[in-house]
């Protein structure tokens, strides 16, 4: 079992360059399935989930190379429509190849995916949306089998029951290549990663508008062509390092970022009493006075991101008074609370609402990590705690953070990473 050992109680001071966004890179790689020319992507983070997606592309027939954060995807053998379950089970984003592969092969079979256990994240939104666009879908033995219809309707409309990021990406991608159709999708996700996917597809020849709003319009085209594209920076990684700086009452600057993507976090930090300095592509936070308790609700973008909720909880553990976080996206996102309470935190969760009473200091302990973002939250708590913390089952975090030890060490953290034996 992998573990991270942290010697806490040190102020973090310095600058962290932020990597490319995994959550932007993965759907773009899935979309590359539909492009029969070379696709070159820069600023791709070297993470386990990215390697998993590249392996999927190789297994279905693409040629792939990955070096120095640059991915090249080229045509290879005849594409296969069957994606091995041993790859799909490793992450949810693998399901995004279902639609693109069906568009190219005429059919595809993809297992229902795995990933972090943070609550219900059914692929039903994907399936119902694809059906609404005309795809024939059946489920058997844990697999989803999709078949492309002989033709699509000229005008298609679908309203998502929930602004699912994955379903928005899936439907927008396949509709881009439905040349006989104009498609309107409403109640879509508005995340920056959706906008990045639209920008990628449009540069490749698609005709899409509306990403960043709750309505996307797609005029299908016959073919997408190969391009070079630069992936946006990872706003969740940036937020993690900023919150680590606040938690240790230090001064941390993140560079290579888009501050507009972090407006919800910056608003919360301002309410906390954090000093914030922004320029075109960097953000710096520092703490000089006493922080104030706050109330926050998570929400789909542009609201406060659920992926930063565990890290914010870690910060609030040592803020005087009672803070409240209401989790409105995933019902099991507070699965880390019992472990954080082992570090002398005072957190009570009732009906998806966490009541956090600040303590003077946290104390190091041995704790067990359940998922990527919970591990990051525990790491931030450990950095501010007195003494040593051992985070067990820590491999999750390397699915979401590139060069984690190197970056934290650069700003003064004392951590050791022990991989699985």
Curated annotation (Swiss-Prot):
A GO MF label: UDP-N-acetylglucosamine 1-carboxyvinyltransferase activity
Residues binding UDP-N-acetyl-alpha-D-glucosamine: 92, 307, 329
Entry keyword set: Cell cycle, Cell division, Cell shape, Cell wall biogenesis/degradation, Cytoplasm, Peptidoglycan synthesis, Pyruvate, Transferase
Modified residues (2-(S-cysteinyl)pyruvic acid O-phosphothioketal): 116
Pathway linked to the protein: Cell wall biogenesis; peptidoglycan biosynthesis
GO BP terms: cell division; cell wall organization; peptidoglycan biosynthetic process; regulation of cell shape; UDP-N-acetylgalactosamine biosynthetic process
Protein EC: 2.5.1.7
Binding annotation for phosphoenolpyruvate: 22-23
Alphabetized CDD domains for the sequence: UdpNAET
Pfam family for this entry, one: EPSP_synthase
Active site: 116 (proton donor)
Function summary: Cell wall formation. Adds enolpyruvyl to UDP-N-acetylglucosamine.
HAMAP family tied to this protein: MurA (MF_00111)
Protein name, per record: UDP-N-acetylglucosamine 1-carboxyvinyltransferase
Biological source species: Kosmotoga olearia (strain ATCC BAA-1733 / DSM 21960 / TBF 19.5.1)
């Amino acid at each position: 079992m992998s573990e991270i050992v942290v010697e806490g109680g040190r102020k973090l001071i310095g600058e962290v360059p932020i990597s490319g966004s995994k959550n932007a890179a993965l759907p773009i790689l899935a979309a590359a399935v539909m492009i029969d020319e070379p696709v070159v992507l820069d600023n791709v983070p070297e993470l386990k989930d990215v390697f998993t997606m590249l392996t999927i592309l190789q297994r279905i027939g693409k040629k792939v190379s990955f070096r120095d954060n640059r991915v090249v995807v080229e045509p290879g053998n005849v594409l296969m429509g069957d994606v091995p379950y041993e790859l799909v089970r490793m992450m949810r984003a693998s399901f995004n190849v279902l639609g693109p592969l069906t568009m190219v092969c005429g059919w595809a079979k993809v297992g229902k995916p795995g990933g972090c256990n943070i609550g219900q994240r059914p692929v039903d939104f994907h399936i119902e949306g694809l059906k609404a666009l005309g795809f024939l879908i059946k489920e058997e033995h844990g697999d989803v089998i999709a078949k492309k219809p002989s033709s699509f309707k000229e005008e298609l409309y679908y309203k998502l029951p929930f602004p699912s990021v994955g379903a928005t990406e899936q439907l927008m991608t396949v509709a881009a290549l439905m040349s006989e159709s104009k498609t309107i999708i409403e109640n879509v996700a508005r995340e920056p990663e959706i906008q990045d996917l639209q920008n990628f597809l449009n540069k490749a020849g698609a005709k899409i508008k509306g990403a960043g709003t709750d309505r996307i319009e797609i005029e299908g085209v016959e073919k997408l062509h190969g391009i070079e594209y630069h992936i946006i920076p990872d706003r969740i990684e940036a937020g993690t390092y900023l919150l680590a700086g606040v938690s240790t009452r230090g001064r941390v600057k993140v560079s290579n970022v888009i501050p507009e993507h972090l407006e919800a976090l910056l608003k919360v930090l301002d309410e906390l009493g954090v000093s914030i300095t922004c320029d075109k592509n960097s953000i710096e936070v520092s703490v000089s006075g006493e922080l104030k308790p706050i109330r926050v609700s998570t929400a789909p973008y542009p609201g406060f991101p659920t992926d930063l909720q565990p890290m914010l909880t870690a910060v609030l553990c040592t803020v005087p008074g009672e803070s409240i976080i209401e989790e409105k996206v995933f019902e099991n996102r507070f699965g880390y609370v019992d472990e954080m309470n082992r570090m002398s935190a005072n957190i009570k969760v009732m009906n998806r609402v966490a009541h956090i009473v600040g303590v003077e200091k946290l104390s190091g302990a041995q704790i067990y990590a359940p998922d990527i973002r919970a591990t990051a939250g525990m790491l931030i708590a450990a950095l501010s705690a007195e003494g040593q913390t051992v985070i067990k089952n820590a491999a999750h975090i390397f699915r979401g953070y590139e060069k984690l030890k190197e970056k934290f060490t650069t700003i003064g953290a004392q951590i050791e990473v022990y991989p699985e034996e």
